[in-house]
Amino acid sequence: MENPTKYNSNELEYIKRVLNAESWSATSGTWCQELESQFAKKFDSKYAVVMNSGTATLHSALVALGVGPGDEVISPALTVIMDTTATIHANAIPVYADIDPETFNIDPKDIERKITDKTKAIIVVSLYGLPCEMDEIMAISRKHGIPVVEDNAQCFLSKYKGRLVGTMGDISSWSFENSKHISCGEGGIITTNNEKYAEIARKIAGHGYKNLKANTGQIKLNQSVYQDPDYKRHSEIGWNYRLSEPSAAIALAQLENIEKKVELRKAIADMFLKEIFDCDYLIPQKTPKYSNNSYFTLGIRYEGLKELGVSWQDFREKYVSFGGDGFYGAWSVPYLEPVMQTRRFTSRCPDIYKGISYSEGLCPVAESIQSKLMQFKTNYRSLELAKQKVLALKKTIDFYKETK
């Protein structure tokens, strides 16, 4: 089985068509519109708005929900910093909820504990491709009247109790960054069934042009109107988050092949999981029976220091020596990053962040697990290459079994 991680479908053909077209911009081309149409259909949504990154989609989603200065946004303590930066770009206050120690996803009970009268939105991240506990989360959302943003940057086609991830929150955000299931180098998209949210997000992504609508990123006006010196264009403060037509063409071709991409990542993850089945110090992310995992990466909690007396770093070094290509440590919990500890971000709205503390111990489960996580790749180009890495892991496990 070959891995369609980069391209092996219509990408090249679509790029040729873009190069032969008159416009490479979303404002007048057709590829961004087609990508939005097909993505909305695939993920059972009324509206889709494509943008140039997953961070842009998160920021636009928060603004569409009305998040602004002094509001609080709850997000998980174990994830990349982009949920935090999107919150800060909305001039809001990041609030962190701890995680479940087995699934590594946000803990609904801690979400509820962190809600205040300032909470304006909740971001939930389907970490590594595993859906969050959406029934509990949406019950909390309805109880308190707080909208939910699904950050599905790492999660494509996973299901939770039979429902497709991306169809349960108020807005869903996706990423087309280089390592994701769908990749066009950089890119992202939001989906929603709410026309108001889609229209605001569209305007935020398109310089705030007043004629942009939920279902189109193009402005169709008579030349005599928009060329008139008295014509007023902008109803919102917006950014240029538009995706280029070449990038949209690549992403569309990738979308057409998404089932195969997810299938292969699952197959590779299964190979690793079988190898560690009886290993008591390599504990994989727990996937509940009512969910499936699209395995953006395979997350494993390492307890070898306690069980073997072998550090995370030494285990990784041995794995590499046997032919493994290394595995990644999990990102530092966002609030312990230097930018948060030195509070450099507060210069934007200093009064808003007075008295806000992000000290160590804020989310103890996430802090404890983060340093133990191993993130094994699942986007190898072929099963044969993946088998070599699985064999390297087997040799590493066997080595420490013999020396134990």
Task: Identify the residue ranges that each predicted region occupies.
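Active-site region of PLP-dependent enzymes
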Residues: 23, 155-161, 168-297, 332-335
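Phosphate-binding glycine-rich loop
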Residues: 25-72, 83-89, 95-98, 163
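PLP-dependent aminotransferase-like
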Residues: 63-152, 159
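Basic phosphate/pyrophosphate-binding loop/patch that engages nucleotide-derived ligands
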Residues: 115, 138-147, 189-210, 310, ...
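Short, conserved charged micro-motifs
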Residues: 306-314, 382-388
